[in-house]
Amino acid sequence: MKNSQTYITPFNWVYCCQFKERTTSDDLLRSMREAIKCDTIKYKQKQGKLICNFCKTENELYENYHVDHYNPSFKTLKNKFLQLTKKQIPLSFGDCKIYKLTIFKDEDEDFKNDWIDYHNKNCNFQILCRDCNLRKKK
């Protein structure tokens, strides 16, 4: 597939159409990302003019700028929190019927809130354009 700047994005129909059963770890990751989504949106909105921290582009569409975790990465934050928490790590998750998202269940509200607090105290964000974010080593 090509985008408007003729950058070729690899695309594989067979891979996309294969249904892979999601694991508990997948659902936990999705729920943790969803729990902090409001904070990432607020960060992006507060930036004013969006400029990619890597390539310095500033003429992309708003939706083509991503909020990226760095130093520490999201993965590092997630893993450290899971090591430190004294709360039971959820093993089952809810589904947001409106947006079709994996979310924490109501009974895991304390775990979710602890995660949000930990994340917000320890995260660093940067703005990257879509292309730089997708090419960035995770």
Q: Which residues make up each language-model segment?
A:
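Domain-exit/linker segments immediately C-terminal to small folded modules
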Residues: 111, 124-127, 133-137
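Helix N-cap and loop-to-helix transition residues
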Residues: 12, 72-73, 129
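Histidine-centered nuclease catalytic patch
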Residues: 58-124
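Short metal-coordination and nucleic-acid-contact micro-motifs, chiefly zinc-binding Cys/His arrays
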Residues: 44-51, 121-125
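A boundary/linker detector
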Residues: 1-49, 57-61
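Short metal-binding segments enriched for Cys and/or His
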Residues: 6, 11-23, 81-104, 135-138
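Short cysteine-rich clusters marking metal-coordination/redox-active sites
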Residues: 52-56, 129
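Cys/His-rich metal-chelating microdomains
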Residues: 58-61, 131-135
